[in-house]
Amino acid sequence: MLGWTLMFLVVAIIAGLFGFTGIAGAAAGIAKIIFFLFIVLLVISLLVNALKGKAPRA
C-alpha cells in the first residue's frame, strides 16, 4: 500500500506542475490517448479473465 501511496503522490505532483505551468493543454491531449489505451487494455483483460473462467480478484 505504501508503494501505491507514493506513486499517487508523484502523479499528483506532476499533475500540479503541469496545471500550474501552463502546459496542461499538451498534457491533456496525451492524457486522452493514454486514457483510451488503458480502457482498451481493461476490456482485453476482462475478456481474458472471463474466458479463463476465473473470478477477478477484489
Curated annotation (Swiss-Prot):
It is found in: Cell membrane. It is a multi-pass membrane protein. The keyword Transcription regulation does not apply. The keyword Transmembrane helix applies. Signal peptide: none annotated. Keywords: Cell membrane, Membrane, Transmembrane, Transmembrane helix. The chain crosses the membrane at residues 6-26, 28-48. One of its GO terms (cellular component) is plasma membrane. Its main location: membrane. Belongs to the UPF0391 family. This is UPF0391 membrane protein Shewmr4_2671. The lineage of its organism: Bacteria, Pseudomonadati, Pseudomonadota, Gammaproteobacteria, Alteromonadales.
